[in-house]
């Protein structure tokens, strides 16, 4: 595709969390190579090139679908993440891993094989494995780096003090240092602001943030009296699935719905959707900073939804009253907001 200049304030990364073979991941909405190609067409039409995938996405099938869609031939840059699933209730998400050295090596090699590439630009440790000394993990990661299997290291879902520990260990041992931190962050989940963000700024670590729409909660699709039978099987808040229960635990409560009602009312006054309120806040009114190398991840369930998100991210700052309502809304849910780390 030809070179197109993005119109967004921040680099936008396409999250591949909804890509997968339906037989392997109940929540997959982008299930064929043709579906993936259509999603990538929409993404690249806005000038964006980075895609974020993980070993657990689609139980490994997200990577293979991206490979089949010829991500390299399209000029994309795909990053991959390794989640330590083995000691968690995540057996349904494919091959199990820890962050023990042998598993880190096996995990990265599995990433490369699935993506059909000899090297990753960015390899991310998706969460801590606190049963493995972090020094052991980082030592093996550095060996993999020195072997030329990836160019940059990222970390995600670690506590702020763990970030300090990791950065200092890497400095002390002359190991490859993390180049960015990936986190959950949105207008109604700002748990990273008091401690993690200052930590990242102190180490000049860019912040890449996901779940800008609260896992889809900040859309027109949901209401508090919505019966379970109305949820599409496998959808983000389907109470019958693992990931549905996970999102419901985080967002599906009266405090969040009270705030959602207020956002909708104020949005109508300015002809703004929930999506526009959430994404324009993140782009213009949050603690993200372009000069710090920060970026925003979006995860479209289909090309039309992705297009809506990308257009919202190209829009200007919100009216002052809307920002005030969003800030007041967060103050009301702050007491029930979960941690930013795993």
Swiss-Prot record:
Q: What is its EC number?
A: 1.-.-.-
Under InterPro entries, the record lists:
AKR_Detox_Biosynth, NADP_OxRdtase_dom, NADP_OxRdtase_dom_sf
**Active site located where?**
57 (proton donor)
Q: Which Gene3D superfamilies match?
A: NADP-dependent oxidoreductase domain
Keywords in alphabetical order: Glycoprotein, NADP, Oxidoreductase, Pigment, Signal
Give the sugar-modified residues.
Answer: 271
Q: What class of enzyme is it?
A: oxidoreductase
Binding-site residues for NADP(+), renumbered to this chain: 52, 182, 236
Quick one: which pathway?
Secondary metabolite biosynthesis
Q: SUPFAM superfamilies, from UniProt?
A: NAD(P)-linked oxidoreductase (SSF51430)
* Taxonomic superkingdom: Eukaryota
Record-level Gene Ontology MF annotations: oxidoreductase activity; pigment binding
User: When the coding gene is removed by deletion, what phenotypic consequences does the entry describe?
Assistant: Mainly produces yellow pigments but does not produce orange or red pigments.
Induction info: Expression is positively regulated by the azaphilone pigments (MonAzPs) gene cluster-specific transcription regulator pigB.
Asked if the record carries the keyword Nucleus, the reply is no
Applied relevance: As colorants, MonAzPs are widely used in various food products for centuries. Moreover, MonAzPs also possess wide-ranging biological activities such as antibacterial activity, preventing hypertension, lowering cholesterol levels, causing hypolipidemic effects, and displaying antiobesity and antitumor activities.
- Per the UniProt entry, the signal peptide is 1-27
Pfam families, per database record: Aldo_ket_red
- Transmembrane segments annotated in the record for this chain: none
The entry's family comment says: Belongs to the aldo/keto reductase family. Aldo/keto reductase 2 subfamily.
The protein's job, in short, is: Aldo-keto reductase; part of the gene cluster that mediates the biosynthesis of azaphilone pigments (MonAzPs), a complex mixture of compounds with a common azaphilone skeleton very widely used as food colorants.
Q: What is this protein called?
A: Aldo-keto reductase pigE
What are the leading ranks of the lineage? Answer: Eukaryota, Fungi, Dikarya, Ascomycota, Pezizomycotina
């Amino acid at each position: 595709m030809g070179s197109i200049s993005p119109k967004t304030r921040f680099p936008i990364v396409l999250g591949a969390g909804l890509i997968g073979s339906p037989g392997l991941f109940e929540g997959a909405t982008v299930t064929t190579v043709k579906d993936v190609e259509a999603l990538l067409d929409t993404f690249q039409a806005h000038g964006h090139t980075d895609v974020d995938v993980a070993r657990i996405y689609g139980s490994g099938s997200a990577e293979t679908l991206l490979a089949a869609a010829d991500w390299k031939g399209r000029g994309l840059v795909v990053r991959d993440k390794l989640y330590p699933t083995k000691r968690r209730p995540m057996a349904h998400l494919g091959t199990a891993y820890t962050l023990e050295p042998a598993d880190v090596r096996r995990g990265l090699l599995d990433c490369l094989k699935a993506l059909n590439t000899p090297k990753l630009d960015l390899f991310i440790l998706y969460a801590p494995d606190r049963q493995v000394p972090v020094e052991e993990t980082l030592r093996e990661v550095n060996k993999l780096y020195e072997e030329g299997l990836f160019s940059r290291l990222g970390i995600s879902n670690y506590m702020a003090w763990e970030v300090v520990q990791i950065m200092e260990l890497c400095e002390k041992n002359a190991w490859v240092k993390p180049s960015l931190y990936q986190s959950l962050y949105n207008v109604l989940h700002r748990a990273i602001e008091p401690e993690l963000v200052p930590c990242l700024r102190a180490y000049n670590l860019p912040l890449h943030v996901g779940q800008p729409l609260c896992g889809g909660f900040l859309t027109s699709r949901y209401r508090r009296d919505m019966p379970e039978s109305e949820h599409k099987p496998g959808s983000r808040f389907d109470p019958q699935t693992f990931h549905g229960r996970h999102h419901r635990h985080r967002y599906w409560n009266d405090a969040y719905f009270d705030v959602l009602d207020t956002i909708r009312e104020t949005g109508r006054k300015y002809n703004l959707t929930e999506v526009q309120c959430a994404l324009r806040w993140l782009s213009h009114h949050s603690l993200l900073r372009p000069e710090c190398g920060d970026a925003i991840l979006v995860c479209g369930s289909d090309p039309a939804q992705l297009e809506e998100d990308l257009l919202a991210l190209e829009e200007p700052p919100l009216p002052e009253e809307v920002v005030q309502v969003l800030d007041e809304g967060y103050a009301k849910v702050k007491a029930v907001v979960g941690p930013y780390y795993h």
